[in-house]
Design a protein with these regions (language model features):
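Electrostatic cytochrome c docking/interface patches
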Residues: 2-31
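C-terminal capping alpha-helices of c-type cytochrome domains
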Residues: 78-129
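Short phosphate-engaging motifs
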Residues: 36, 44, 110
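The canonical Cys-X-X-Cys-His
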Residues: 27, 31-40, 114-118
Length: 129
């Protein structure tokens, strides 16, 4: 990963405290913004963006039947709670060249909630820190 592909918009975040702000029901509501481009269902189809089933813990750019940007494929880090939080603040600044056009989620509670929701949508949700 080079500085040409990724500009860090990372602030030091206590991910445990951040996720404690989250609410699963609120996350489902916030995810409706995401659902314009992403499905989040077992066996679901890719849409404009990849299916986000099992996204937490998955390697970025790894859904085999989705055509990612070169930047996302090169990024290839695991979508941890921390990585997802940093990405969702401002996706295009975090991974330069990503195809994701969404501006980001400024509110911590919105990010925490949608991360909790996405984590719940998988075969083996990751334990919370």
């Amino acid at each position: 990963m080079s500085s040409e592909t990724t500009e860090k918009v990372v602030e030091v975040v206590d991910i445990k405290a951040l996720l404690a702000m989250g609410d699963l029901a609120h996350g489902e509501k916030v995810f409706k913004k995401c659902s314009a481009c992403h499905m989040i269902a077992a066996g679901g189809k890719n849409m404009i963006g990849p299916n986000l089933w099992n996204v937490i813990g998955r390697t970025a750019g790894s859904v085999s039947d989705y055509k990612y940007s070169k930047a996302m494929v090169a990024y290839a880090k695991e979508w941890t709670f921390e990585e997802m939080n940093s990405y969702l603040i401002k996706p295009q600044a975090y991974i330069k060249g990503t195809k994701m056009a969404f501006a980001g989620l400024r509110k911590e509670k919105d990010r925490a909630s949608v991360i909790l929701y996405m984590n719940s949508k998988g075969n083996n949700p990751k334990p919370l820190p």
